Amino acid sequence: MVKENFIYVGIDLHKETHTAVTIDCYNQKLGEITFPNRPADFPKLVTKVKKCNTDAKEVVYGLENAYGYGRPLAVWLIDKRYFVKDVNTAISHRQAKHRGAMYRKSDSDDAEAIALATLNMLDKLPDACPNDAYWSLGQLVHRRDNIMKQRTRLVNQLHEQLCIAYPSYKQFFNDISRPTALYFWEHYPSRKYLKGKSVEDLRTELVPVSHNKCSTKTCEKILDAVASDKVKNNAYQDARDMVTLSIVSDLQHYDSQLAEVDKMLEQMYKMLGCTLTTIPGVNVITAVKILAEIGDIKRFSNANKLAQFAGIAPLHLSSSGKGKDVATKQGNRRLQATIYFLAIQMVQVSSKGTPRNSVVRAYYEKRKAEGKTSQQALICISRRLISVIYGMLKNGTEYRMPVVENAGEKL
């Protein structure tokens, strides 16, 4: 693509309005427009750009995060057969800071920085591909993340209540949010509700809930721990019991929501025909998180561009003939974190000394032997995983475990 043959439109996206700035290949500002974020008003943008485009050149639109507030506009522009590029926020911010002697912050300045980033990185920026399937998958993944955050807060609140009502609660329930534990807190929010309960009574009640996993020994442990705590019945215990019951009810609700979301995620994963779960250590949840961030793999022409998008490609810094590779601070942080966490999981070794993934572990040890730190070796694994994931998504192939002797060459 010859840059002189295009004009560039950078669009700063917001919930209610968008601001667009048009520049030419020499970074001369040609025009600006602010328009509502409604499909009925999108033609105003094209009309304004046509007035600025006196030489009838091709137009390239750069959208900062084309999968959020700008998704309807990206879909509309693509349907009109325009070139649409997805500009990472970190890239446009860097352009804004280096544009002049004084850093300015406004919608117009941001839009101009996005246009400049589109001009300077025309061949490196990924095409915007707001596919409905991947967008819906991303919505489900974000919903699941929000549910898990809320659930974690509720579990912490439940810990706060239980440490007063049952000081030794960790002796009989290691996981206080599993179904059996939630049933117990729901029916026995404080020790006064256990008065008169025998071991057999408690076992008869908990066995069906735990699917026959709650033994007589566990029930004895519960009653013995409660008796040994010698907790006095404090004033206003009923009010605190109500708080416990409310937290348990919320946890049960979120667990139900989580099960529904996970079921839908599994259905969508199968519908997309993905093969990422054939990689050892990758389950459906990890796979859909990766898919939601990458989107349509066709928008990346090679694995290097995907690595750059994820912020995993090393950045080379050098001066006077000396240099080193460092981790970049740009890219999709969510995708980067998912891949890095996956790399950590794949190099783990069991208590018996058996590696979870012998090939990845051998590659990790090879990099460590070359003098790299653990973090640098994990980044190397992350970069290899990006290439593996790219090839699998591009070709629809399953993961094939290579021979350990060749692990230093490929994963």
What does each of the following model-derived ranges do?
Residues M1-L411:
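A detector of single, family-specific signature residues
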